[in-house]
Amino acid sequence: MAVKMLNVPSLPNIPWQEKPADYKLSSPVWRYSENPVMGRNPTPEIARIFNSAVVPWEDGYIAVLRGEQVNGIPYVYLGHSKDGIHWDVEREKVPFVDDNGNPKMPHYAYDPRLVKVDDTYYIIWCTDFYGAAIGMAKTKDFKTFTRIENPFIPFNRNAVLFPRKVNGKFKLLSRPSDSGHTPFGDIFISESPDMEYWGHHRHVMGRGSNWWESVKIGGGAAPIETTEGWLLFYHGVATTCNGFVYSMGGAILDFNEPSKVLYR
């Protein structure tokens, strides 16, 4: 029986390209033949851009993008597209504010995630809070971006929010680490009744025995609800003589207890 996605709206304009006839690898995914869809410096302020987080918005798509400024400091920017292929990137940084509407800009921001829960969009990124930590904000219109309390103390990264509450609680995947370059490398899950206070931390899965995920792993996009459970795409990292190599893996987490890994 085919696995089906649940609670996912139909997207008639989602970009798609069939698998090339001469594609020789057995991988279930393949690269878009017209890559890159976005140049490395789409605005004068951005020297390099990558790590995008994309959701449907109005009659097209909106993205939160990691843009490294010309001074080397990373930040997050908004991108807009009608078809998911051709993008316009805003020149100004995402303008984060506090609950009173006063500016509350992080020192830096990178590796963003973007998730819709109910009628609110949540932006999650790696921020500077006495070390690498998880920053969070919310918006309903992509004009006002209100900061939320950081869910954890440093050091932590790769936070991924589930797209709906599970058993009445928000669920968040993350990867705790030390002050170095993430040697801990395992994925944990936490829950919250209100997106402010987090607890009930549970281990989800650790680094694998496969070479490509032997150093560290981390959650990618928001988990996808399917007939088999929560489909989680994650990255695995291996160390080579030329530095880190990143690969993509997949896992199925239990519907009601997503700390349980059913398939990997």
Task: List each model region and its residues.
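Beta-rich carbohydrate-recognition and catalytic domains
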Residues: 1-107, 115-215, 224-264
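Active-site/ligand-binding surface loops and adjacent short beta/alpha elements
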Residues: 220-222
